[in-house]
Amino acid sequence: MVDDPYTLAVIDFSSQSQFTDEKRIIVGTPALTGGDLLEVWRTNEIPENGNFGEIQYRTTSTLVFGQLLMSSDSGDMESLTHAIYQQISQLQHELSYEKMIRVWNYLPWINRHDDGLERYQSFCVGRHQAIDTSLGYESHLPAATAIGTHDNHVLV
């Protein structure tokens, strides 16, 4: 199934987030039971690969499935998150996709304190600042999850 041309994405729950290609998203959250755990997303169209800034994505005529992986050493969590969500908004505009359906945010050391705030709180501030600059965005908010990891990358 992983090599099927109709596979939109493969989420690989491993020990460290990394980028291998547009189809495979490797998340730094290993399965508690050990062993490999893959989640496969398929579509009825053959997806096309693309990239925009630091976003790698796959698209069909009706959806975009993307990933953006950045080292958390690239800046403080608030600024990093703001930059990530600005890129996402720009890609949405570029591809004429108004709404996101679902967003998973994988944050390293989510409860660690940086500059007086938990990293999760700093993430929320940066995301809000990026979202708040997009006219009417509040009516298109997606379902979203923030998950803590033990590696050094932010993956959205």
What name fits each language-model region?
Residues M1-V156:
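Short, polar/acidic, helix-capping and beta-turn segments at strand->helix junctions
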